[in-house]
Amino acid sequence: MSLLTPDSGLLFWMVIVFGIVFVILAKYGFPVITRMVDERKQYIDKSLLAAREANEQLANIKADSEMILAKAHEEQARILNEAVATRERILKEAKTQAQVEGQKLLDEAKKQIQAEKDSAISDIRRQVAVLSVDIAEKVLRKNLDDEKEQMEMIDRLLDELTVSKD
């Protein structure tokens, strides 16, 4: 039981050694330990402050990015609307121009057809006139021998002329 109840000499030396160790620690160890704890506390405080600032910057950056995205979406919508309007305008202009060109071609074709028709009619009239003169000449040679036949022919031609004019 000597370990559980130490002698007074042992107790004296233990107190002395403890006191010396305590004084040495108090003079050299505790200031270093408290300084390190204070430095660690300052480092943690600085880190917390930096983290808080980083979170604020992140929130600001996030708000800025959302604002930029909103502007980009607005710009995209504006550009798309302009593109649609431009496309519609171009299509309308092209359609109008195509109608104008089509009408122009149609008018030219009508003029050309009318000119060809007039040319064909005048050509046919000329041919009919030539044929009529040839036929009349042959008929007249044959029929003009008799005066009675001449009068009948003149009457018939006059009747045909009045009927064709009506």
From Swiss-Prot:
What membrane topology was assigned to this protein in its record? Answer: Single-pass membrane protein
Q: What InterPro entries does the annotation carry? A: ATP_synth_B-like_membr_sf (IPR028987), ATP_synth_b/b'su_bac/chlpt (IPR002146), ATP_synth_F0_bsu_bac (IPR005864), ATP_synthase_B_chain (IPR050059)
Annotated GO CC locations:
plasma membrane; proton-transporting ATP synthase complex
In its keyword annotation, does this UniProt entry include Transmembrane?
Answer: yes
Q: Where does it localize?
A: Cell inner membrane
Q: Which residues cross the membrane?
A: 10-30
MF terms from GO for this chain are: proton-transporting ATP synthase activity, rotational mechanism; proton-transporting ATPase activity, rotational mechanism
Key word Transferase present in the record? no
Oligomer status and interactors:
F-type ATPases have 2 components, F(1) - the catalytic core - and F(0) - the membrane proton channel. F(1) has five subunits: alpha(3), beta(3), gamma(1), delta(1), epsilon(1). F(0) has three main subunits: a(1), b(2) and c(10-14). The alpha and beta chains form an alternating ring which encloses part of the gamma chain. F(1) is attached to F(0) by a central stalk formed by the gamma and epsilon chains, while a peripheral stalk is formed by the delta and b chains.
User: What is the recorded function of this protein according to its Swiss-Prot or TrEMBL entry?
Assistant: F(1)F(0) ATP synthase produces ATP from ADP in the presence of a proton or sodium gradient. F-type ATPases consist of two structural domains, F(1) containing the extramembraneous catalytic core and F(0) containing the membrane proton channel, linked together by a central stalk and a peripheral stalk. During catalysis, ATP synthesis in the catalytic domain of F(1) is coupled via a rotary mechanism of the central stalk subunits to proton translocation. Component of the F(0) channel, it forms part of the peripheral stalk, linking F(1) to F(0).
- Write the protein's name: ATP synthase subunit b
Annotated organism of origin: Phocaeicola vulgatus (strain ATCC 8482 / DSM 1447 / JCM 5826 / CCUG 4940 / NBRC 14291 / NCTC 11154)
